[in-house]
């Protein structure tokens, strides 16, 4: 990835995730078309809207995580819950989120400032709080539908897995097992 633009690598990740989502959607449609299938579970309109919103939030979070990874910004914050000992560290959003640039370079051609890496990492971290809250709320609503309790358990388990592996990456200086687990 050293020779590729971070935007290209991140878009490649999102393309792979879109393919995975489409394959899963096709799998569910196939399962529901089987004879003897109980059919789809009806969800309240509010739960369906929240499901779509959480899907969108997760999609943005995956993009932000890809941006952290492709910019090698994971070690910009090496403490938790603060970053560099601050609740709001020095950040450079303009350079950190300039999409079309070479790896490690600002769009001006200069080296990417450390504050840009901090901005990339910290935005991913803060958005994780929003995503985690949305997933917890959705899991609670799904738990109230007996046919969706298994899905609710999976949702909680995956959210906790992402939180744990993300935290492990920060406090243990990016061990390979945690990095791979958080990515996949």
Model-identified regions with their sequence ranges:
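Polytopic transmembrane helical bundles with strong interfacial aromatic enrichment
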Residues: 1-184
């Amino acid at each position: 990835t050293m020779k590729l633009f971070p935007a290209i690598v991140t878009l490649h990740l999102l393309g792979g995730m879109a393919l995975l989502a489409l394959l899963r959607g096709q799998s569910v449609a196939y399962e529901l078309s089987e004879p003897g299938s109980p059919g789809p579970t009806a969800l309240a309109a509010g739960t369906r809207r929240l499901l779509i919103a959480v899907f969108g939030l997760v999609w943005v979070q995956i993009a932000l995580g890809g941006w952290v990874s492709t910019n090698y910004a994971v070690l910009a914050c090496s403490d938790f819950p603060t970053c560099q000992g601050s609740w709001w560290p020095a950040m450079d959003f303009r350079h950190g989120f300039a999409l079309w640039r070479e790896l490690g370079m600002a769009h001006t051609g200069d080296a990417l400032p450390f504050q840009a890496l901090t901005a990339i990492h910290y935005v991913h971290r803060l958005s994780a709080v929003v995503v985690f809250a949305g997933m917890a709320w959705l899991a609670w609503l799904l738990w109230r539908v007996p046919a969706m309790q298994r899905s609710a358990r999976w949702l909680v388990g995956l959210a906790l897995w992402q939180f744990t592996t993300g935290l492990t990456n920060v406090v243990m200086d990016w061990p390979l097992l945690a990095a791979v687990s958080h990515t996949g």
